């Protein structure tokens, strides 16, 4: 019958106080402490979720294409202190649930170690840390993500230790802006989410303002991107260096290479080829928050030619330039 967490106690106190006189604010009191301010912020964030209905028949624009084995995707909106869970329903993203979250004290778009910000981008769960392997501060479990990713490092961003995790055992939830950059959930919510997270597979897409689109728009974008990747694959098989290299930006980079060195290398390699076959499978495509027209494309690649065979997991960052 009684509340079990701090915000609920604050609301209960307001309800009792309202019997005596009208309230002027949440946590009606003069000279509010920092804790009261934090609780008010949490109340506003939670109330906003119920006042603003979920977009009907719309999904985050980032969920362009799941790979077949990717069962779920996580989308975080730091601006609304909300985490959304979507299921891969035969390639179509279906809303499952959403949860209140805490993010970085200094806001979003992490740049460097210790800036107290939550990163924005497309990330993937890299590990599952049970309660027995972490301190009580992190709650019932933790799921590290791959910040900084390849794009972050290219932008000169650094830092480490960005996790999805819970809260201490004596706490139910934390204020909207209270972490050092991690995404923090109440322990019951983390436990619910944990069942659907796949290490190495589940994308965690973090935005400061999630954009929603209808299914038709998303399907059209999926078709366009699939065709662009297929054109790239086919032009690679053609051994026509000009056709192949037209897919690459002049600002292209790979470990130890820029566009100029990549251009020279591919022309030299193609000169020794009489045939090339490239098969792509298990491909996912996710839009990158804050970078219009940029997509993270991940796939299994099976390459064979007259003088080389290899298989690898490849991740590329595609961007429409012209």
Feature map (PLM): residue ranges:
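Surface-exposed, charged secondary-structure patches
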Residues: 265-315
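Exported/periplasmic cell-wall-interacting domains
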Residues: 129-230
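Gly/Pro-biased beta-strand-loop elements
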Residues: 51-163, 168-173
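Alpha-helical linker/edge segments of TPR/alpha-solenoid repeat scaffolds
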Residues: 16-59, 275-278
């Amino acid at each position: 019958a009684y509340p079990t967490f701090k915000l609920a106690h604050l609301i209960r106190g307001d309800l009792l106080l309202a019997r005596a006189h009208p309230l002027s604010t949440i946590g009606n009191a003069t000279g509010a402490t920092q804790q009261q301010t934090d609780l008010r912020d949490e109340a506003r964030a939670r109330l906003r979720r119920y006042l603003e209905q979920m977009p009907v028949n719309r999904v985050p624009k980032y969920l362009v294409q799941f790979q077949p084995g990717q069962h779920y995707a996580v989308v975080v909106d730091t601006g609304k202190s909300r985490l959304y869970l979507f299921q891969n329903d035969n390639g179509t993203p279906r809303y499952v649930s959403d949860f209140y979250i805490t993010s970085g004290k200094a806001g979003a778009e992490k740049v460097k170690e210790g800036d107290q910000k939550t990163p924005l981008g497309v990330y993937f769960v890299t590990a599952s840390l049970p309660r027995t392997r972490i301190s009580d501060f992190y709650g019932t479990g933790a799921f590290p993500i791959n910040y900084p990713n390849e794009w972050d490092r290219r932008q000169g961003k650094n830092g480490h230790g960005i996790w999805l995790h819970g809260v201490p055992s004596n706490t139910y939830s934390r204020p909207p802006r209270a972490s050092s950059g991690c995404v923090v959930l109440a322990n019951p919510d983390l436990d619910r989410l944990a069942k659907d997270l796949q290490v190495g597979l589940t994308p965690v897409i973090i935005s400061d303002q999630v954009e929603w689109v209808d299914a038709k728009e998303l399907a059209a974008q999926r078709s366009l991107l699939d065709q662009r990747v297929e054109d790239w694959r086919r032009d690679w098989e053609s051994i026509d260096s000009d056709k192949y290299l037209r897919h690459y930006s002049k600002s292209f980079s790979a470990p130890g290479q820029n566009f100029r060195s990549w251009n020279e290398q591919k022309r030299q390699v193609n000169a020794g080829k009489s045939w090339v076959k490239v098969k792509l499978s298990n491909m996912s495509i996710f839009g990158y928050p804050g970078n219009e027209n940029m997509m993270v494309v991940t796939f299994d690649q099976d390459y064979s030619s007259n003088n080389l065979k290899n298989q690898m997991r490849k991740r590329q960052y595609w961007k429409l330039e012209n």
